[in-house]
A protein has these predicted regions:
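Alpha-helix initiation and capping sites
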Residues: 41, 74-78, 111, 133
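Beta-strand-connecting loop/turn residues
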Residues: 45, 57, 122-124
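Histidine-centered nuclease catalytic patch
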Residues: 49-92, 98-100
C-alpha cells in the first residue's frame, strides 16, 4: 500500500450516471476503459491495496465503500480504485469480510499508508510502533480487512530477497567506513529506481531498514 495522488477531473462519461437511477452495469466498455486510464494515472499497473502487479484479466474497478452499503458512491470518482483479482486479498477480500466501519480503512489517496504500516524483510506487514490507539486500530483493521498478510507475506518475501542483500551491503559499508557517506546517495538512487516496481513500498522499507 502506498500514497496515491488522485487527479481532480473525473474520467470521461462518469458524470452522466446517477445512483438510484443508473446501475453500475450500465457503464459501457469504453467508459470503463476511460476509468482505467484515469486509475492508471493515479496508481499505475499496481493494485491500490497490496501494491502487486495488475493487468488485463487480473484487475477490477474497486469501490472503496461498497455499492451495496453505500450506493451514493457508485459513480463517485473519489470512491474508485483499481484492485487486483487475487482471491482472498485486497478488494475481493474486503467485499467478503462482513460489516466494518469504512472510516477505519486507510484510504491511500487522502492518507499516507507509510504513517500506519511497516513492511519487514520477512515479507510481513504490521502496524508501526508509536501509533495512537486509534491509528493502531486502523492499521490492524486495514491489514485484516484487505488481508495484506497471509499469502501476500510469502509473495513479498520472494520479491525482497535480492534487496535484503543490497541492504546488507550498504550496512556493511557504512559500518566499515563511518566517515564516508557516499553510500547514502547510492541508496537513495536505488530507492528511486525501484519506486515503480510491484511491492515498492516493502522494497523501500527494507532498503532503508525501517523495521530495525
Amino acid at each position: 500500500m502506498r500514497r496515491l495522488n488522485r487527479q481532480d477531473e473525473p474520467p470521461a462519461g462518469l458524470r452522466r450516471y446517477r445512483h438510484g437511477r443508473d446501475a453500475w452495469s450500465a457503464v459501457t466498455p469504453e467508459e470503463r476503459m476511460a476509468i482505467w486510464l484515469s486509475l492508471n494515472l493515479m496508481q499505475g499497473p499496481r493494485c491500490a491495496y497490496c501494491d502487486g502487479p495488475m493487468g488485463d484479466g487480473n484487475r477490477h474497478i474497486e469501490h472503496f465503500r461498497q455499492r451495496g452499503r453505500y450506493p451514493q458512491g457508485t459513480f463517485d470518482w473519489s470512491n474508485l480504485f483499481g484492485s487486483c483479482n487475487r482471491a482472498g486479498t485486497c478488494g475481493m477480500a474486503k467485499d467478503q469480510c462482513g460489516a466494518y466501519s469504512p472510516e477505519t480503512l486507510i484510504k491511500p489517496d487522502i492518507e499516507d499508508p507509510d504513517v500506519f504500516l511497516l513492511f519487514t524483510p520477512g515479507g510481513t506487514v504490521r502496524p508501526r510502533a508509536g501509533l495512537t490507539a486509534n491509528n493502531h486500530l486502523r492499521a490492524t483493521e486495514t491489514i485484516r480487512i484487505l488481508v495484506l498478510d497471509g499469502a501476500l507475506n510469502q509473495i513479498r518475501r520472494a520479491q525482497l530477497c535480492g534487496y535484503i542483500q543490497t541492504m546488507e551491503i550498504f550496512a556493511d559499508y557504512a559500518e566499515a567506513y563511518p566517515d564516508d557517506d557516499s553510500w547514502v546517495e547510492e541508496l537513495e538512487r536505488e530507492v528511486r529506481d525501484t519506486a515503480h516496481l510491484p511491492y515498492a513500498t516493502a522494497i523501500r522499507h527494507v532498503l532503508t531498514r525501517q523495521s530495525e
